[in-house]
Every structure is written in structure tokens, then in C-alpha cells.
């Protein structure tokens, strides 16, 4: 009877263990690290089997009975490396684990709430870490379509010109389409390029492309962790309707000064980090800059004399006041510069009224300078109130700005006339955000992880400001004219949001995550309110099998107006207005998963997605003359996307890799008839089939090989079926009239390519040297990187009538593109 009383008392006494899990070599906190403990059902408050084993029972029988009446309780660190786990008090064995690190086991006599900070050592070889607990991504997560992108996967993938890239790695995932061949835009489950929330340490970025989309702004050396959501979205995220890319950067090495330098065909990179005075304060700095001697070849493929350059700078300082308080200050800035200059000179022989000869000299000079980029700064404060309540408070400032300046000059000199005409034009647009946010993690019981918080963002949109100056000097008479055209005045928008979600577990086989995101947007006297319910369910059947289903509603208050297949810096970001409503999406997903085979993960997911208030240009309005008239040239409609995604990943051994396949269909419809006569038409990036295989092979201690092979259906584009030469309306000339049967009426041929790279490592006295050699499009597939619509003249021999047949001109300039780079790490 005394024994039963003791068990009952223990069941009522719970203790909480909390703290940070760090990398022993660097002091960096580890995101997604696990802690677990095995407890008996009796100790955890469960029912006993009612079978008593006597003193003569064998130790093996007792062990089997103990295992049968035991269960595992686990927890996972959040995005700041903090964990908390509530378990029965008493003598326990805690196991801490992280992929690629050796497990740490710790026995403690737990009698009260306790703080335990643990450091894990990297293992000599990648091992299978058993992480039990609530993860935000992967098969173990309750969420669907949530993936963690390992840093090593990003660095090892072969890409254009040998530059590892976060966004290009995400393109390998099922359900994700790339934009133009070779470029880094992503289109997720039928959504547009502007429907992806790109976050750097919790702060959104508006333009994440360099080189017109060839690379993203995320420098791999600065990246600590990347989490990608495309199916079920945690309630703490909002603002976009298709995907979330959450990039977290390094805090800095607390153990010593370390870094790397790298040089390749495209850019040079620096990364340094270390402590300041003590391990409590750390810093991290990364910089990347471009040289253009190889990229000039790509620019010249368009037949234009141009120069291009870009840079990125990441900086971060972290200070730990105590185990309960930590302060972060982060900064990023990046710029792209595009310069174009052209000059045309000519001289002609003419005759005057009396047939006297004279020479006319003409000269025309054109220069254009275009620059754009992001700058952001943020300060975050972590505070641990107690073992069950964790908070993060942040304030941020973010700006995106684009500026274009063109200068033209026309000179003419002759015996009869003389003039000098100069014209300068500047165009500026941009966005500025000021935000404040607070997030809480609250664990009232082992079966609940409640996240809640709120955010306020003040948006300033500056769609377009034009300035021009003309100077005309004709025959010695000089005239100057200045003009300022603020085509669209400043637009202010205030966005407020609040959320709550609860990741609940019911036993070992069922988990449920309900959530609600509420958002309010105020602009020009109009208020929009969008409730966004979210829910995700996971049912585990044992032996690695699981089934998940989810529903998410998302809303978006900003649009990007683009008239081409590339995301260009001149594309405008504009907010919703009184006439343009928020974009909303509803997505339902169902999938099955298997992880019972050691080192392997398999998944099959199906989804259906409905989008409302998506924007397209009206027929005949594929571009706009100024930001003032953009609302008149676009129309709101609906879109739908549905498909099936298969994903296989091998994570252990000398050979690792992924296989992904997507079968999907995406279309749009504008029922008012202003687009495609109100009929449904395919989305530009409706690619029916998308197949990708990636492979990483260790060929020894010093050499590793990576390869990617992809094949995908072609994009859609709008082409005219015939063209007719007709008399212009003024009767003074001829004009070409195109007949277009429907929007997006032609699918480009499928594209495929093989990329590979080889890394050669060598240990040096004070670090490691890495040579990288790669080849993009290794067998020279002629996939179109640029497509234009021309016409071909055809003459009917019987009637003599001339017609013009559309003809596509396809340019391929990413062909047999080699790369190499040198990296030294210390």
C-alpha cells in the first residue's frame, strides 16, 4: 500500500527542465535539436498493467515489462535554441541529440525545476539521431509541406557559376517551380513570384534576387538554418499566400576567431566570426561582391554593351546577459548596379539648293544607370520568464529602393544647322517598413506547446517619382526645362496581426495543431480584416508510418506588378486599395509518410488550392505607362491549383540525395470577360510534370561529388496565330495587327539538364582548403533562357497576298557553363 502511495505521489509531482542546446565547437545555439527521456506509464500518471512480477522473475522479464510500460517524452529547441520539457520528478536519464552530432546522455536526480545548458560535439560521420518532440518541419512535424534545408545541402548543390544558393536549393523540392531556365525565382503550388514570404531573421525582404534572378541575396556562409513551408502554415506566419522561406543567420562563434575566404568565377566572399571580450558577446560578418569578367559573356548574349555588379553585407552582434536574457542586433544591405552605355556616330554627304556639297556630322550618346536593393536592421530580445514561458521581442526597419537614371545627348553639326539636345530622366520607387513584434512560447503541460503573439507594421509605398531635365541648344539659343512627376503619391498602410496556435499531442500516435491568425490592414481610409484559420493533424501508425492532413487560409496585402517572365527591379510593389482587394488562398492537403527504413524518408502529398483576387493585366495592357494608372490596367480573378507530390530523401551513408516528382495543374479565370473572354486559361508556370534527382557521393575523406538532373514541362506563353499588315488608322502608314486566340496558348518544349560539381578538401596547418569544380548544363541541352516572338513573311503564290506567321526566337546562353572556386576555412 505504501508503494502505491509513493507511485501516486510521484505522478502528481512534475518537474521542468529547460535551457539552451549549443554546438560545442562554436557556441552557436542549435535549432531543432532534441531532448528526450523514457518514463514508465506509472511515473507519468498512466495506468499499470495490473501484472505483478515477483522477486524470482528474471531480469530480462522485468526489463521487457518495464519497456512495455514505458513511453518517450521529448522536446525540440525553438529558433533560438531554447528547449523546455516537463517530466516526472525523480532519477532520470536525459538524452540530447542533433543531426551530425554525438548524443549526450545525462543522469540527474530531478527534484525541482532545473536549467540545463548542453553543448554537443560534431560526430566524425553523419549518424541517425533520434529526435522526439515537436518539430516545425520534416516528417516528425505535425505540419505538412514543411521542410528543413540543411546548410550542407545548400553548399554542396551544383549551381550556375559555382555559387551556392538558398532559393535554387528550394527549387529542388516537390511543388516548387523555377522561373526562367537557370534563374532563382520560385513559384509554389500555382502561386506567383510575389506570393512567397522571404524572411531574414524574422524580417521580410521584398526583392531577393541578384543578376535579374540568377542568384538570391542570401549568402550561404551567413546562413544557419532554412525552413520552408508550402502546405500547412503555422499561425505565427502571415502576409503571403503561397510559401514561407524562413532564413536564420549565424550568431557568431563564442569559442574563438574563425572564418573563411572564397573566390570564384563570379564573386569573392568573406566570412568572419568570433567572441568580443568573452563568450557572452559574439559577432558575425559576411560580405560578398561580384566581378564581371565572366558575366559579361551572358550580358553580351543580348547584344548590349553593359556592366553589372552586386554586393551583400551581413552583420550581427549577440550578447548574453544571463541564461534568461539575450540581445541580438542584425544588419543586412545589398545592392545591384546595372550600367549601360552606347554611342552612335555618323557623317553624311549632302547637297544644298545650289548643289553645293556639305557634310553633316551626327552623334547620339545614351547612358543608363540602374541600382536597387534592400537594407534592413533589427533588434531582438529573448527573455525567459520561467521554465514554461519564453518570449522574443523584436523591432525592425526595412527598406527597398530602386533608382534608374538615363542620359541621352544628340549632336548635329553642319554648314546649315547646328544643335545640341540633352535629356536626363530619373525614376525612383521603393518601400519602407517599420515593425514591432512579440512572440511567446508557453508550455503549460507536456502535451501542449502554445505559441501566441502580435505584430504591427507601418508600410510606406513610394510607387513612382519621375524627374526630367531637357537642355536644347539650337543655333546658339539655349532652353532648359525641368519637370517633376509624382505620378502616384505616397501610400501609407498600417498592418496589425495577432495569432495563437497550440501543438497538442494525444498519446504517442496523434497530434493536432489548431491555430488562428487575425490580420487588419488600413489604407486610404479603408479597413480590411482577414481571419485566417489553420489546422494540421498527424496520425502515426507505428513502424515509421504516418498520415497527415491540413487546412490553411492565407491573405496578402501587397502585389508585385510585372509584365515579363523575369522579376525585374522596375516591377512595382503596390498595396491593396479601395478597389483592389487582398489576395486570399485556401489550401487543403493530405499525405502519407514513411521513415521506418533507417536513413530514408518517403512522402506522398496531394493538395488542392483556391486563390482569390489574383491580379493579371487586362488584354492589350501587358505593361503600364506610369504607376498612376496601374489600377485601370489590371483585373482581379481566381486561380486554382491541384497536384500530387512525391519525395524521397536519403540522409545517411556515403551516398545521400533526394528524388522529387510533381504532377500538377494550375490555371486562372477572370469571369468579367476582360481577360481571355472570361474563359479559364493555364498559368504561365503551369508545368504538368517536374522531376528532379540530386546525388551527393563521398569518394573518400577528401573528395565528394554532387550532381543534379532535372526534367520539367515547358512554360506557357501567349503567341499570335497570325499577323496581318493593315492600313493605320490615320491612313498614312501600315501597321501590323496580331490575332491571338487565347491567353497562354503555347507551351514551350520540355527542358532538362545535368549539373555536377566536385569538392576537393585538404587539411592545412591552420584550417582547410577546398577546391570546387563544376559544370552547369553538362551535356549542353538547348533549353531556352530567353524567348521572343518574331514574325516570318509568307507570300501566297496564287493570290500574291502576303501574310505573316508568328515565329519564336529562342536564345540559350547557359550552355556548358564551367565553374570553379577556391575556399580557405580557418
Describe the predicted segments one by one.
Residues 343-344, 348, 401, 543-588, ...:
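Surface-exposed extracellular loop regions of Gram-negative outer-membrane beta-barrel proteins
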Residues 76-78, 100-102, 132-233, 244, ...:
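Periplasmic N-terminal accessory/gating domains of Gram-negative outer-membrane beta-barrel systems
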Residues 22, 34-40, 62-64, 93-101, ...:
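Short, acidic, small-residue-rich periplasmic hinge/interaction motif at the N-terminus
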Residues 318-336, 368-524, 540-542, 603-604, ...:
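Face-selective signature of the C-terminal outer-membrane beta-barrel domain
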Residues 41-82:
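Short, acidic Ser/Thr/Gly-rich low-complexity loop/linker segments typical of extracellular
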Residues 608-610, 632-721:
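Gram-negative outer-membrane beta-barrel transporters
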Residues 424, 429, 433-437, 486-487, ...:
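Outer membrane beta-barrel strand-and-loop segments of large Gram-negative receptors
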Residues 702, 711-734, 749-755, 759-826:
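C-terminal beta-signal and adjacent terminal beta-strands/loops
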Amino acid at each position: 500500500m505504501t508503494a502505491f502511495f509513493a507511485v501516486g505521489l510521484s505522478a502528481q509531482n512534475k518537474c521542468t527542465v529547460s535551457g539552451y542546446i549549443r554546438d560545442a565547437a562554436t557556441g552557436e545555439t542549435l535549432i531543432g535539436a532534441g531532448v528526450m527521456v523514457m518514463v514508465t506509464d506509472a511515473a507519468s500518471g498512466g495506468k499499470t498493467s495490473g501484472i505483478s512480477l515477483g522477486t524470482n522473475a528474471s531480469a530480462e522479464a522485468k526489463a521487457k515489462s518495464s519497456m512495455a510500460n514505458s513511453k518517450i517524452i521529448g522536446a525540440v529547441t525553438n529558433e533560438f535554441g531554447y528547449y523546455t520539457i516537463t517530466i516526472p520528478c525523480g532519477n532520470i536519464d536525459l538524452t540530447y541529440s542533433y543531426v551530425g552530432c554525438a548524443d549526450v546522455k545525462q543522469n540527474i536526480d530531478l527534484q525541482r525545476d532545473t536549467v540545463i545548458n548542453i553543448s554537443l560535439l560534431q560526430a566524425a560521420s553523419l549518424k541517425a539521431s533520434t529526435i522526439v518532440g515537436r518539430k516545425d518541419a520534416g516528417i516528425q512535424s505535425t505540419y505538412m509541406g514543411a521542410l528543413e534545408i540543411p546548410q550542407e545541402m545548400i553548399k554542396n548543390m551544383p549551381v550556375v557559376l559555382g555559387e551556392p544558393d538558398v532559393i535554387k536549393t528550394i527549387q529542388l523540392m516537390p511543388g516548387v517551380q523555377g522561373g526562367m531556365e537557370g534563374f532563382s525565382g520560385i513559384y509554389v503550388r500555382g502561386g506567383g513570384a510575389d506570393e512567397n514570404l522571404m524572411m531574414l531573421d524574422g524580417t521580410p525582404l521584398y526583392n531577393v534576387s541578384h543578376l535579374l534572378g540568377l542568384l538570391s541575396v542570401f549568402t550561404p556562409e551567413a546562413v544557419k538554418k532554412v525552413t520552408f513551408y508550402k502546405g500547412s502554415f503555422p499561425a505565427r506566419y502571415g502576409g503571403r499566400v503561397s510559401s514561407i522561406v524562413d532564413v536564420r543567420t549565424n550568431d557568431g562563434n563564442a569559442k574563438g576567431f574563425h572564418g573563411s575566404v572564397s573566390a570564384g568565377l563570379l564573386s569573392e566572399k568573406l566570412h568572419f566570426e568570433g567572441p568580443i571580450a568573452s563568450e557572452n558577446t559574439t559577432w558575425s560578418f559576411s560580405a560578398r561582391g561580384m566581378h564581371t569578367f565572366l558575366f559579361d559573356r551572358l550580358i553580351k548574349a543580348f547584344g548590349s554593351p553593359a556592366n553589372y555588379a552586386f554586393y551583400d553585407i551581413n552583420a550581427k552582434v549577440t550578447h548574453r546577459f544571463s541564461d534568461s536574457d539575450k540581445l541580438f542586433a542584425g544588419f543586412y544591405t545589398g545592392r545591384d548596379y546595372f550600367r549601360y552605355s552606347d554611342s552612335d556616330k555618323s557623317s553624311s554627304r549632302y547637297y544644298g539648293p545650289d548643289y553645293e556639297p556639305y557634310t553633316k556630322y551626327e552623334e547620339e550618346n545614351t547612358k543608363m544607370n540602374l541600382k536597387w536593393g534592400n537594407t534592413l536592421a533589427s533588434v531582438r530580445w529573448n527573455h525567459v520568464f520561467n521554465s514554461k514561458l519564453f518570449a522574443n521581442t523584436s523591432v525592425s526597419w526595412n527598406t527597398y529602393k530602386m533608382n534608374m537614371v538615363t542620359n541621352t545627348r544628340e549632336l548635329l553639326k553642319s554648314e546649315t544647322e547646328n544643335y545640341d539636345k540633352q535629356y536626363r530622366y530619373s525614376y525612383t520607387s521603393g518601400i519602407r517598413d517599420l515593425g514591432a513584434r512579440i512572440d511567446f512560447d508557453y508550455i503549460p503541460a507536456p502535451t501542449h506547446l502554445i505559441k501566441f503573439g502580435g505584430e504591427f507594421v507601418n508600410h510606406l509605398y513610394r510607387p513612382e517619382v519621375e524627374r526630367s531635365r531637357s537642355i536644347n541648344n539650337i543655333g546658339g539659343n539655349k532652353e532648359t526645362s525641368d519637370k517633376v512627376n509624382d505620378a502616384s503619391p505616397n501610400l501609407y498602410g498600417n498592418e496589425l496581426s495577432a495569432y495563437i496556435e497550440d501543438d497538442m499531442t494525444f498519446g504517442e500516435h496523434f497530434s493536432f495543431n489548431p491555430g488562428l491568425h487575425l490580420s487588419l490592414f488600413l489604407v486610404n481610409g479603408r479597413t480590411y480584416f482577414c481571419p485566417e484559420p489553420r489546422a494540421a493533424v498527424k496520425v502515426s501508425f507505428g513502424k515509421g508510418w504516418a498520415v497527415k492532413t491540413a487546412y490553411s487560409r492565407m491573405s496578402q496585402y501587397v502585389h508585385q506588378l510585372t509584365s515579363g517572365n523575369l522579376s525585374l527591379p522596375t516591377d512595382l510593389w503596390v498595396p491593396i486599395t479601395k478597389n483592389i482587394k487582398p489576395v486570399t488562398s485556401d489550401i487543403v492537403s493530405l499525405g502519407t509518410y514513411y521513415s521506418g527504413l533507417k536513413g530514408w524518408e518517403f512522402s506522398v502529398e496531394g493538395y488542392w488550392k483556391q486563390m482569390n483576387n489574383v491580379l493579371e493585366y487586362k488584354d492589350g495592357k501587358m505593361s503600364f505607362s506610369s504607376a498612376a494608372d496601374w489600377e485601370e490596367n489590371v483585373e482581379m480573378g481566381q486561380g486554382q491549383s491541384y497536384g500530387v507530390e512525391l519525395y524521397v530523401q536519403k540522409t545517411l551513408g556515403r551516398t545521400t540525395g533526394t528524388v522529387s516528382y510533381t504532377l500538377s495543374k494550375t490555371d486562372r479565370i477572370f469571369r468579367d470577360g476582360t481577360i481571355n473572354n472570361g474563359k479559364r486559361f493555364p498559368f504561365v508556370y503551369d508545368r504538368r510534370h517536374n522531376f528532379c534527382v540530386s546525388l551527393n557521393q563521398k569518394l573518400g575523406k577528401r573528395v565528394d561529388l554532387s550532381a543534379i538532373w532535372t526534367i520539367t514541362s515547358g512554360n506557357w506563353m501567349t503567341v499570335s496565330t497570325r499577323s496581318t499588315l493593315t492600313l493605320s488608322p490615320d491612313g498614312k502608314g501600315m501597321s501590323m495587327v496580331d490575332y491571338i486566340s487565347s491567353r497562354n496558348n503555347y507551351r514551350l518544349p520540355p527542358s532538362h539538364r545535368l549539373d555536377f560539381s566536385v569538392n576537393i578538401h585538404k587539411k592545412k596547418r591552420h584550417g582547410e582548403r577546398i577546391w570546387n569544380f563544376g559544370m552547369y548544363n553538362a551535356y549542353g541541352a538547348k533549353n531556352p533562357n530567353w524567348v521572343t516572338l518574331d514574325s516570318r513573311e509568307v507570300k501566297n503564290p496564287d493570290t500574291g497576298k502576303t501574310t505573316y506567321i508568328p515565329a519564336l526566337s529562342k536564345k540559350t546562353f547557359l550552355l556548358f557553363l564551367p565553374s570553379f572556386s577556391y575556399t580557405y576555412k580557418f
